Amino acid sequence: MKMKIFIITIVIALFITSIVEAQNKLDVKCVRLETCREPCKKQLCLLPMKCMNGKCVCSPSRKIC
């Protein structure tokens, strides 16, 4: 029984790690906040950035410090 719980814990930990790694691959940075003519590459976001009103913005507006 203890071995089964241990294996389930390992599987859950690996699953969470894979989700975090996938999220890190989605991170986009912004080069210029004032224009979206170039790809967004300066700010780190939890999700890819979008060009809104000529500016690169995080969507949702949560940044990774």
UniProtKB/Swiss-Prot annotation:
Subcellular location field: Secreted
One Pfam family here: Toxin_2
GO CC terms of this entry: extracellular region
Keyword Endoplasmic reticulum: no
Keyword vocabulary terms for this entry: Disulfide bond, Ion channel impairing toxin, Neurotoxin, Potassium channel impairing toxin, Secreted, Signal, Toxin
N-terminal signal peptide: 1-22
Recorded GO MF terms: ion channel inhibitor activity; potassium channel regulator activity; toxin activity
Annotated disulfide bonds: C30-C51, C36-C56, C40-C58
Keyword Secreted: yes
Listed InterPro entries: Scorpion_toxin-like_sf (IPR036574), Scorpion_toxinS_K_inh (IPR001947)
Tissue expression as described in the entry: Expressed by the venom gland.
SUPFAM superfamilies (UniProt xref): Scorpion toxin-like
Family from the record: Belongs to the short scorpion toxin superfamily. Potassium channel inhibitor family. Alpha-KTx 12 subfamily.
Domain notes: Has the structural arrangement of an alpha-helix connected to antiparallel beta-sheets by disulfide bonds (CS-alpha/beta).
Function: Inhibits voltage-gated potassium channels.
Annotated protein name in UniProt: Potassium channel toxin alpha-KTx 12.6
